[in-house]
Structures are given as C-alpha cells and as structure tokens.
Amino acid sequence: MVSPEVLERDRSAHLPSWPIVLLIVGLAALYLATQGWRDRHLFLINATESLPNWAFVVERGTSPVRGKLAFFVVPRTPLIVAHFGKEPQPFGKTVYGMPGDIVTRADNWVSVNGARVAHLKALSKRGEPLAPGPLGRVPQDCYFMGSPHPDGFDSRYADIGWVCDKQIVGTGTTVL
C-alpha cells in the first residue's frame, strides 16, 4: 500500500508551480494588451535623408496637426515607382499647410501663408524633371506636407501634391 504522503508528492511533482502559472498568465495578459496597441500603431523606419530621424511610431487614424509629423500613402506615379518601388512604404513629412492655407511660389521658393517652407528643384538627383506642385488654397481635408531637406520629395512637387485625408495613415512620433 502507498502512503498518502507519497501520493501527494507524486501528484505535486506533475503540477506546475505557482510562479510558472503566474508567468504564463502574465505573458498572456501582456500579449492581449499589445494586440490593441499593435492595431492602432505602426513602427516605421525612414530610409531617406529627408527627415533627420530614422525611426518612428505612427498612431493610426489620427489627424494631421500643423508642424507635426504625419505619415501617408503616396500616389503610384512613374517617378515614385522608379525611386521607391511598386509598393512604396508610407512617407513621413511635416505638416506645413492645413486646409484653407495659401501656398505660393516665387523664385523657386514655396511658401505657406507667406512663410518660406521649401526650395523647388528642376531635376531629381537622377536627372529626371520634377514638376512643381499645386498652388493656391489648400483644399478641405487636404494638407501641404514637406521637409526641410533640400532633396525632400513632398508636396512641393506634383507627384506628391496635396495629401488628403484618404491617404493619411496617422501621425508620428520620433523614436530614434
């Protein structure tokens, strides 16, 4: 006959210890909590020189704010496909112009509400012609996006143009 102490010892040898159970429950809770975060955020790496930072967290579905970073889907024009591929990653730029703002150009300088924001180049680094972007009042639900970099590819050029709400992925925060 087997003593009750031996039976209890054998049974407890096959049961997980409380710290292991708590660790598994904690990891499951962390996983479920990050699911919601992941559905609302992206982590993007900048592969160009147009912004000084190279890593961003993007909060999906948030509206652009003047002076802040916003990320958007670009049109698939021949120039964009030639430089960024058939499925380019979202572009990140600073919001320079909001709906109703006025965009003008003089001596290849682009201004928003009279403040210079970007210099216009005639040719890309590869020698392709760059058509100037739109001028006038920024339409409702659209934005003028830019970067301080002289080779920035943004709303100053027709291939990007106005960036409208349907293109917006979200707003970004620099990480690195």
Language-model region placement:
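Protein maturation boundaries and topogenic segments
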Residues: 1-90, 158-176
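Acidic/glycine-rich C-terminal interaction modules and beta/coil loop segments
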Residues: 6-8, 123-172
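Residue "hotspots" at secondary-structure boundaries inside conserved domains
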Residues: 62-63, 95, 101, 136, ...
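Structural motif
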Residues: 67-70, 101, 142
